[in-house]
Curated annotation (Swiss-Prot):
It comes from Mus musculus. The gene is Glrx3. The modification N-acetylalanine is found at residue 2. This is Glutaredoxin-3. Transgenic mice with cardiac-specific Glrx3 overexpression show that it is a potent inhibitor of cardiac hypertrophy induced by pressure overload (transverse aortic constriction). In addition, overexpression dramatically increases the ventricular function and cardiomyocyte contractility. Its main location: cytoplasm.
């Protein structure tokens, strides 16, 4: 009994509750050396209560990470500052800067994000020479993380300097497919990359791990029409939709995901699919407006959810219900019909 009480006490302390904007800002200042994960929650939402339990478990696994819960409606100034429009929402901070965000009750995704940020910022204690070697290997991996990598201040959605914003605009204008790294999220990378590539400023653009240059060089390449030949193009929407509809044998395009449907029709179709025992994957159309609108034309089907088997449209909820009632759904899902 005493041991159980002690364990409960440890779990309770592991997640800190913040009740004011001042307390939150103070916590950001104090926790600059560690990852800070903040859960914007509401006591009336059962999914938030569940995610608090998930946070408590993660806190046990990651004692060096600071986990915080903040009641969104009780501290509106913080919620408004970070554009919290629904609960649960999780924000990730490093060096007092927001580096990531997760909307919704997605326990596996929360766990993945925590693990990723912990590993990206952690270096084993070692000698200076080993640290330099480790950093060099890490920078090599980062510059090769995608065919085209942009190291910038902020993110493509929220650039935090004019040069980074201009760079993103040029890449988007030329339909260039790229991934990005926010140098504000990692001071070691920010300083190390300057030496690694012998380039003192940001943003920096890499293709196949090789430095192309900063904004001025990219502007020159754009003017000479060389940029399109150097950087990889993003796939056209139709090609992207073909890939998405064939991503799994059974693909459901819906509002929300398996864990949390965000409309009644999507919830009903999930229940039907779950009852079949057939494996399937989902795509949340609320997270990608281009896919949401494009798929309507691509398949000539104006509403959601939409179910695909091996890339072919089966239909929406009404058709899936009919197929189930006729005993035809399972053979179709298994590719037998």
């Amino acid at each position: 009994m005493a041991a159980g009480a002690a364990e409960a006490g440890e779990a309770a302390v592991a997640v800190v509750e913040v009740g004011s904007a001042q307390q939150f800002e103070e916590l950001l200042r104090l926790k600059t050396k560690s990852l800070l994960v903040v859960h914007f929650w509401a006591p009336w939402a059962p999914q938030c209560v569940q995610m608090n339990d998930v946070m408590a478990e993660l806190a046990k696994e990651h004692p060096h990470v600071s986990f915080v819960k903040l009641e969104a409606e009780a501290v509106p100034e913080v919620s408004e500052k970070y554009e919290i429009s629904s609960v649960p929402t999780f924000l990730f901070f490093k060096n007092s800067q927001k580096v990531d965000r997760l909307d919704g009750a997605h326990a596996p995704e929360l766990t993945k994000k925590v693990q990723r940020h912990v590993s990206s910022g952690a270096f084993p204690p070692s000698t200076n020479e080993h640290l330099k070697e480790d950093l060099s290997l890490r920078l090599k991996k980062l510059t090769h993380a995608a065919p085209c990598m942009l190291f910038m201040k902020g993110t493509p959605q929220e650039p935090r300097c004019g040069f980074s914003k201009q760079m993103v605009e040029i890449l988007h204008k030329h339909n260039i497919q790229f991934s990005s790294f926010d140098i504000f999220s990692d001071e070691e990378v920010r300083q190390g990359l300057k030496t690694y590539s012998n380039w003192p400023t940001y943003p920096q653009l890499y293709v196949s791990g090789e430095l192309i240059g900063g904004l001025d060089i990219i502007k020159e390449l754009e003017a000479s029409e060389e940029l399109d030949t150097i950087c990889p193009k993003a796939p056209k929407l139709e090609e992207r939709l073909k890939v998405l509809t064939n991503k799994a044998s059974v693909m459901l395009f819906m509002k929300g995901n398996k864990q949390e449907a965000k409309c009644g029709f999507s919830k009903q179709i999930l229940e039907i699919l779950n009852s079949t025992g057939v494996e399937y994957e989902t795509f949340d159309i609320l997270e990608d407006e281009e896919v949401r609108q494009g798929l309507k034309t691509f398949s000539n089907w104006p509403t959601y959810p939409q179910l695909y088997v091996r890339g072919d449209l089966v239909g929406g909820l009404d058709i899936v219900k009919e197929l189930k009632d006729n005993g035809e759904l399972l053979p179709i899902l298994k590719g037998e019909n």
